[in-house]
Regions:
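Phosphate/pyrophosphate- and phosphate-bearing ligand-binding catalytic cores of soluble enzymes
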Residues: 38-114
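Oxyanion/phosphate-interacting regions
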Residues: 69, 86-186
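DPxDG-like acidic metal-binding loop motif
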Residues: 1-28
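Short, surface-exposed beta-edge/turn micro-motifs
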Residues: 8, 48-49, 149-153
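Solvent-exposed alpha-helices and their adjacent loops that cap or buttress functional pockets
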Residues: 24, 42-48, 144-147
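Short polybasic amphipathic segments
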Residues: 29-34
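Short amphipathic beta-strand/extended segments with alternating polar/hydrophobic composition
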Residues: 13, 25-26, 37-44, 165-166
């Protein structure tokens, strides 16, 4: 649920183990897996043996500085943005990176990660830098503006997202810009 541009309640069903698991959060009340409170704890930088959620085309979209490519970990793209964010909130993935998801793909996951003590960053269009995610719009954002929202999202433990965001280079590729423009025209 998004209220005035801010995710306030989230729940995601993870269809695994015997009967599955529900990861849920409410703003200012933490993230829980069923009844167990989740708390993200990471290191200073990504670890090679841990999972990281990146889009399958990450190598064409992003460059890596200062050895980040060797540190980024075991890369996975599971096909569900909210599922990857839920796994990030529970600590199964150390980071998740998404190029241009829609609000309905990330709203629940953003709250899950933040309420688990994690950090969510969004890449700005003006400076192409990374800023902490605050909301999907202002208090007066219209439904159409929410529908049209798209942003590059990086989520995980605060130390790790800061480390990665300082070493991640966005490659402006004409083909990707053309595809996005065509998608937006549909």
């Amino acid at each position: 649920v998004v209220f005035r541009g801010i995710p306030v309640v989230a729940a995601v069903f993870l269809p695994w183990r015997d009967s599955g698991s529900i990861i849920h959060a409410r703003i200012d009340n933490g993230t829980f897996e069923n009844d167990r409170r989740l708390k993200l704890v990471g290191g200073e930088s990504p670890q090679r043996g841990r999972l990281s959620g990146l889009p399958s085309y990450y190598w064409a979209m992003f460059g890596f500085r200062n050895g980040l490519r060797r540190q980024i970990g075991e890369i996975r793209s599971l096909g569900s943005v909210v599922y990857e964010l839920a796994l990030t909130a529970r600590g199964s993935m150390q980071i998740s990176l998404f190029y241009s998801p829609k609000i309905w793909d990330v709203a629940a996951g953003v709250l899950l990660v933040k309420e688990a003590g994690g950090d969510v960053r969004v890449r700005t269009q003006k400076t192409h830098g990374w800023e902490p995610f605050l909301s999907f719009g202002s208090r007066t954002t219209t439904l159409q503006e929410l529908y049209d929202w798209r942003g590059t999202i990086l989520a995980g433990d605060q130390n790790i997202t800061q480390y990665v965001s300082r070493r991640l280079i966005y490659r402006r590729r004409l083909l990707f810009r053309l595809r996005r423009w065509l998608q937006d025209k549909r």
